[in-house]
Amino acid sequence: MEAVNPVVLGQTRAKQYFHNDKERKKVIPLLIHGDAAFAGQGVVAECFAMAGLKGHNTGGTIHIIVNNQIGFTTSPRFARSSPYPSDLGKIVEAPILHCNGDDPEAVVHCAKIAIEFRQKFNKDVVIDAVSYTHLTLPTKA
């Protein structure tokens, strides 16, 4: 699910190179994650770890977590040891914005803040859009 992340970051870096975008302002990488995949797949942490390297830096990525609180039909308390899936963003001291995923205006507000921060500081930003599964999924307890 998260295998596309390094591909997107590489494409972003290439477009910045070919547009002579040395300030990394013209092309912004945007990654959309599920809550369990963001916290549970190592490729996200690897991308965070490489973000600060000169040859891999894209000027910051905007990460949006679509957090339905039941990733892969697993309750959050069994899926990770931290309270929020977005805690992984603390690795690079990224600001983490939590919002109600069922309130489009709240999500847009967070997105505007994220873009402004990214453009000003050239750092990653994480938006945790918390929602819930409206139709229950069959699971075993």
PLM regions: where:
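Conserved small/polar residues in nucleotide/adenosyl-binding loops
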Residues: 133-141
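Charged, amphipathic alpha-helical interaction segments
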Residues: 52, 116-119, 138-139
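Conserved phosphate-handling catalytic cores of large alpha/beta enzymes
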Residues: 76-79, 96-126, 131
